[in-house]
Amino acid sequence: MSSDIKAAFFDIDGTLTSFVTHVVPRSTIDALHALQKKDVKVFICSGRAPSYMGVVLDTIPVEFDGIVGLNGQFCTTRDGLDYRHPIDLHDVEIITDWLQSHTDVVANYAESNYGYFNRINAALERTWNSLGETAPKIDICNPRQRIGNHRTFQISPYVDKATEAEIAGMCGNVRGVR
């Protein structure tokens, strides 16, 4: 009897990798291989940008069938499906202007194959350190140097929910996701 399950989707942080050990257990790798032997396609589904996934995926001896990255804004499969939905440039400019006038706020900008921060502070360092070996490299860049020539898929300011709502309210096509 064949299985009705055709695909399985797995998050990286806290699902495939432990928040404690920052590694993928052997039992998880074996389970992923068992799914593939049953012709179940195995996908990564993450809020991470593709450029931030390699530090984890390179340690997992599994060939994934595709990724759903950036909370669904970037999807690709080995079969050639490619879906990309960047943030409207006008909204990126509004958020960038807000961030430039709030110099205490750190934000991560995610492009399809590059991620960077507008600045660094102690809170960012603590968050990144909590990821252990699964933490991607931190690059610092002035967003104004990139947003006009590179599509931005996600901007993650390190703010509370009320400030997030304020920022999203200034934009026409943006909503906060936590």
Language-model features, listed with the residues they occupy:
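Short amphipathic alpha-helices and their capping/turn segments at secondary-structure boundaries
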Residues: M1-S3, G54-T59, M170
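Short, basic/glycine-rich phosphate-binding loops at helix/coil junctions
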Residues: F9-D11, F74-T76, R146-N149
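Short amphipathic alpha-helical segments
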Residues: I12, G80, R151-I155
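A short acidic/small-residue loop/turn micro-motif
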Residues: V24-R26
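Conserved acidic, metal-coordinating active-site core of Asp-based
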Residues: V105-V106, A110-R178
